[in-house]
Amino acid sequence: MPYIPHTPNDTKEMLAAIGAQDIQDLFDEIPASLQYAGFQNIPAGINEMEMLKEAQNQAQKNRNGICFIGAGCYEHHIPAAVWDIASRGEFLTAYTPYQAEASQGTLQLLYEYQTMICELTGMEVSNASMYDGATALAEAVLMAVRLNKHSKTNRVLIAGTVHPFYRETIETIVRNQHIEVITLPFDEQQGITDLGSLNQYTGEDITALVIAQPNFFGCLEQVDKMTSWAHHNKTISVACINPTSLALLKPPGSWGEHGVDIVCGEGQPLGSPMASGGPYFGFLSTRMAHVRQMPGRIIGRTVDKDGKTGFSLTLQAREQHIRRAKATSNICTNQGLLVTAATIYMSLLGPEGLSQVATQCHQNTHELITALTQIEGVEQAFKASFFHEALIKLNQPVQSVLQQLADAGIAGGYAPEQHYPQLANTLLVCATEVRTAEDIAKYAKTLKAIMSKRGA
């Protein structure tokens, strides 16, 4: 194979130059008990054809199970054209060009992305993306604190139904910024925020309210009432949403009497594969009145001196180009490649295609829950309506059930007990548009056998 850097003679000369007998001498300071002996069994180098065959043999060992896990990362069908286009050399770059205006194609794509996000969320302006959904929400909280000039306490109410990892990220980022985070309890019968717990803060100095839709349990919150409460209480409202759901649900810009102030979320469902947690991208949009406090880059459309349309970075005085203490955020880049894929994904599907995806997700999950709750020992945990994932309760230890499902080639869901101790032996399950009737039937049949085995 070409490009192997060191020949045996090269290695011999370098070892002689430093007075070593062999490469192992370079690691002689590491005790033998701490050295892994298995590397000695690695064979000598092979040619490209042999290597490809070995890689194929290893790949055949992978288990491609049926996935019913959601909890923030979702398996959706990605049209082949999405990554075929996104991988073109014009788009697949290491970083945003420092002379950004030289890359008009990239800037136009980001501008189109911003337009699509605004159409989805019902807001007026979007940035060019954030790191992921969790950091987008944390930045939205910081933005809300900057925006609320009436508040003197910097207290932020966060629904307990917001993704627990997102809440942990917020706590980490605001910990030393004199911001108090208050978690609202949820109704353990309905699976949504207890409005009574929210109403007890009426008239108090609350800086921001964070609402998830759908929430971590897949349930649909009473977003109109929560948003209107925030408006009447002079509180900045922040919506953390799943973009797929917006093809069916009311956009946050229309919640309540006046809509929310900031919308953010995880962009992974828009054309990014599940990949061990990333890379993904976060999106953030807001009202034009708040644009100077919005973190991240913004692409604007303008006209040059010859009257030709052009695209450029705009409102840079609120970003990292100014003194660090004056900038809106320490985040100074965007997830351009993932945004490219998302823009292509949304363009290829269009409004009708996105609606079909959301509808199929909704129907599949309802069919899944119907099938699973017919099994003795399985019941739906919450009564509230849900979008494309829901919580079921088992009368057996959930980890044992998950292991047996895995042995049968089924990733059965996510157990939220580590975040919510009161939800012992529950399972968060999801069925997107890629799950078939056969997949759902196999899950139900396998789970029924597992549950009946315990009862026998």
Curated annotation (Swiss-Prot):
Role of this protein: The glycine cleavage system catalyzes the degradation of glycine. The P protein binds the alpha-amino group of glycine through its pyridoxal phosphate cofactor; CO(2) is released and the remaining methylamine moiety is then transferred to the lipoamide cofactor of the H protein.
UniProt-recorded name of the protein: Probable glycine dehydrogenase (decarboxylating) subunit 1
GO biological process: glycine decarboxylation via glycine cleavage system; nucleoside metabolic process
Annotated CDD domains: GDC-P
HAMAP family assigned: GcvPA
Pfam family, one: GDC-P
Organism from which the protein derives: Legionella pneumophila (strain Lens)
Entry keywords, A to Z: Oxidoreductase
Catalysed reactions listed for this entry: N(6)-[(R)-lipoyl]-L-lysyl-[glycine-cleavage complex H protein] + glycine + H(+) = N(6)-[(R)-S(8)-aminomethyldihydrolipoyl]-L-lysyl-[glycine-cleavage complex H protein] + CO2
Coiled coil stretches, renumbered: none
Gene assigned in the entry: gcvPA
Subunit-structure text: The glycine cleavage system is composed of four proteins: P, T, L and H. In this organism, the P 'protein' is a heterodimer of two subunits.
EC number annotated for this UniProt entry: 1.4.4.2
